[in-house]
Curated annotation (Swiss-Prot):
The gene is hssR. Its main location: cytoplasm. Residues 124-222 bind DNA. Member of the two-component regulatory system HssS/HssR involved in intracellular heme homeostasis and tempering of staphylococcal virulence. Phosphorylated HssR binds to a direct repeat sequence within hrtAB promoter and activates the expression of hrtAB, an efflux pump, in response to extracellular heme, hemin, hemoglobin or blood. Gene3D superfamilies: 3.40.50.2300, 6.10.250.690, Winged helix-like DNA-binding domain superfamily/Winged helix DNA-binding domain. Keywords: Activator, Cytoplasm, DNA-binding, Phosphoprotein, Transcription, Transcription regulation, Two-component regulatory system, Virulence. Phosphorylated by HssS. PANTHER family: HEME RESPONSE REGULATOR HSSR, REGULATOR OF RPOS. Transmembrane segments: none annotated. It comes from Staphylococcus epidermidis (strain ATCC 12228 / FDA PCI 1200). This is Heme response regulator HssR.
């Protein structure tokens, strides 16, 4: 099932859009502020986000940029602002599509599906490598009959590596893609997350392992 984040300070619109998407078997998570939606994403993953521009606190432009930079989520702007300058700013913020209010729900559905096709996200949102299955919707990994839920950052890191098997990622690559380039913490946090993931993969008896490439970084490989 596709998971959709909807952020708008208009509660009636949230209910309206959510009810129509749910009828199309799209699970929705609705929030009236960008801050609340980001709190939610600390523990959950979604496939796509629909974002209004005019909101108190964090506006839609800032939220869009955060969703793209930190969570790599496709975004559709849904807003009453139809000025060319607003559209330009939205696309510069990273939005994948721009829909103006009033709108037809059918058109919004077409656009959601079109954006997801571009991202090649399927309804199950799963990735398999060897005997390891990663489910992005639930942030869980499965080997055989055993399933384990992972913390957000650990799952994002493993998903990044597994999506690019044998590609070597430096610490800076990983920090930029998972924590953001403005991250000011210790770069050894990558090593800590890698160590935890190795322990989890070993516990599940996964055929996938995370290899250290001396002087370069990390990659995933399948054990023979």
């Amino acid at each position: 099932m596709i998971n959709c984040l909807i952020v708008d300070d208009d509660k009636k619109l949230l209910q309206y859009v959510s009810s129509h998407l749910e009828r199309e078997s799209i699970q929705t998570h609705t929030f009236t502020s960008g801050e609340a939606s980001l709190d939610f994403l600390e523990n959950k993953n979604v496939d796509i986000a629909i974002v209004d521009i005019m909101m108190s606190g964090m506006d839609g432009f800032e939220l869009c940029q955060t969703l793209k930079d930190d969570y790599h989520i496709p975004v559709i702007m849904l807003t009453a602002r139809d000025a060319l300058s607003d559209k330009e700013r939205a696309f510069l913020s990273g939005t994948d599509d721009y829909v103006t209010k009033p709108f037809e729900v059918k058109e919004l559905l077409f656009r959601i599906k079109a954006v997801l096709r571009r991202y090649q996200i399927n309804a199950d949102n799963e990735l398999q490598l060897g005997n390891l299955i990663l489910n992005q919707s639930y942030m869980e990994i499965t080997v055989g009959s055993k399933t384990m839920n992972l913390p957000n950052k650990e799952f994002q890191l493993l998903f990044l590596l597994a999506s690019n098997p044998k590609h070597i990622f430096t610490r800076d690559d990983i920090i930029g893609k998972i924590w953001g380039f403005d991250y000011e913490g210790d770069d050894r946090t990558v090593d800590v997350h890698i160590k935890r993931l190795r322990q989890r993969l070993s516990k599940l008896k996964s055929s996938v392992s995370i290899q250290t490439v001396r002087g370069q970084g990390y990659r995933v490989d399948q054990n023979v």
